[in-house]
């Protein structure tokens, strides 16, 4: 923690601190700012809840093992999007905060929807897991304050109604994504389609 506190400030921590210890949360993450610092979130937040994330394994297993080890060195736990979904759900049930990068093109596995008016494929996973486990979705942003300094902001939690389905819930989260991507456009690293 001491290694990064001089380059990173935290904002609106109450939005994550107020999540009950026994309840998990979905952290809606973006490729923005210094996004690799998200793997150090476990060291940064005062909650006792474990922090983990879904990740896409790299094709080269040697490089993948090295990168995964580096990312998990801060105490976060990573779950492969190909084989780790069951473990990720158990993690969430035990009160874990599960980070999911929501801004990647999801291909055939994604939900076809409009993003900034253009047809796109978005992962429905944050919506599916939030609905299934009735846990909040907390958007997390990394804004560049100056060269080499960032602010990690925990936005207001979104509690999805159990009366809506994954399609409606994903559309709702896409609106949140659009707002964040518009607000923080200089920090977003986003190449879709």
Specify the residue positions occupied by each region the protein language model found.
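Exposed alpha-helical structural elements
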Residues: 12-18, 62, 66, 87
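Conserved short-loop catalytic and cofactor-binding motifs
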Residues: 4, 55, 76, 114, ...
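Non-catalytic C-terminal accessory region of glycerolipid acyltransferases
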Residues: 19-22, 44, 48, 82-193
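Short acidic/polar alpha-helix capping motifs at helix-coil junctions
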Residues: 5, 32-33, 50-53, 90-92, ...
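Catalytic core of membrane glycerolipid acyltransferases/transacylases, capturing the structured
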Residues: 23-82, 108-111
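A conditional alpha-helix N-cap/helix-loop micro-motif detector
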Residues: 6-10, 60, 78-81, 119-120, ...
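A short, well-structured juxtamembrane/interface segment
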Residues: 2-25, 33
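Active-site phosphate/pyrophosphate-handling residues
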Residues: 14, 33-36, 125-128
